[in-house]
Curated annotation (Swiss-Prot):
GO cellular component, one term: plastid
Binding partners and assembly: Homodimer.
Protein name: Ureidoglycolate hydrolase
Reaction(s) the record says it catalyses: (S)-ureidoglycolate + H2O + 2 H(+) = glyoxylate + 2 NH4(+) + CO2
Signal peptide (UniProt feature, chain positions): 1-25
Deletion consequences: No visible phenotype under normal growth conditions, but mutant plants show a slight reduction of growth on a medium containing allantoin as the sole nitrogen source and accumulate ureidoglycolate.
UniProt cofactor note: Binds 2 manganese ions per subunit. Can also use nickel and cobalt with lower activity.
Amino acid sequence: MESLKRFLCSIALLLISLLLPSSLAQQQQHESIRTMEDFSGYPIHEPGQFGSINLASSLSVDAPGLQNQIDELSSFSDAPSPSVTRVLYTDKDVSARRYVKNLMALAGLTVREDAVGNIFGKWDGLEPNLPAVATGSHIDAIPYSGKYDGVVGVLGAIEAINVLKRSGFKPKRSLEIILFTSEEPTRFGISCLGSRLLAGSKELAEALKTTVVDGQNVSFIEAARSAGYAEDKDDDLSSVFLKKGSYFAFLELHIEQGPILEDEGLDIGVVTAIAAPASLKVEFEGNGGHAGAVLMPYRNDAGLAAAELALAVEKHVLESESIDTVGTVGILELHPGAINSIPSKSHLEIDTRDIDEARRNTVIKKIQESANTIAKKRKVKLSEFKIVNQDPPALSDKLVIKKMAEAATELNLSHKMMISRAYHDSLFMARISPMGMIFIPCYKGYSHKPEEYSSPEDMANGVKVLSLTLAKLSLD
């Protein structure tokens, strides 16, 4: 029995002697890391501690909390639920902005606003002098739309920062969230107003200062001041402009607004390009008159001219023989708008887009030719044919695409490369920064309508990809 005890003691001593050097070495390594951290002022992470694979496994999204925030934000609306109407500089818009700024502050971000109400929330990195990595979207909503368009990219960005903070990640480059002013053209007829100004549009800044008014003849400056912005006494908006290279990269998380991801059962869309959009305003003037007293041969009907042009838009788009060419008559208004009065004036607003800029411009040219032909044929006056904007397409940056695709793969999420056919603030951010977009599925591709919906799971997947991509880019 004694011999057995001596044998077991010998084995125990041998095991202790083998394990002790490894334990001491690990302790010495930890002490060395702490010493280097104290000396440098920066965290020195152990190998793999914040490697992207390990970080991917530690990302935890508060999906119910994000959904609750989206629901709460949707209550700031001038339309009854489930519709959302949130127009630039209205009381509901101001309240919604206040709500988002509070969420940014709760996330520990430094919050600031510029002269037109672009809102910025920054998480300072370990090297704050480096250009930051930015992300964001918009929260304004066209009349009677849904609660996810743009909002997922703002509230999802705040949650992405919270996700990274909960994981223990420390960014090298600062991370900044941008809430863009007026991505929708609802009030002043200008899409992506805030991001256009950030990209340095002098023409827009001058127009906003001097000529731009809304449907009630309220000037942009008056409206901005009513919401607490544009306080410069000279109405100078150039302070909004950002220099090229202000950001290392810009990312936008967004619902797809189309059915492809849902139809194909995919989690993530990695956007490679944004289609080239253009918008037109057209007006015809006729002689009007009584609907019963003026016989058909004597009419110069501005309403029928508008109707004929609307059909011509469809015809010219289809003539391109490309699935990527689209055209929409989104507004058609008749004056005086009475059932027993022949329209004396008509107003159309036309949207046309394509991934091929030259092909889109050909469609615009044909629409203008048709407008002139219709005016002559119907003996009405083409009083306005105005190209409001005619923007080029934007390509996503190759490095940003690579990082987004890597993030999706490391998170075991299915993804595909795809084109964005809708307007986004990213189109203009691409003029000052490398850009990329992350799409998530939405129910039946619905958007700009109350049925717009993205599931908490799909939003959480998007937030994870955004978080991991931000982390990757912040360490570059």
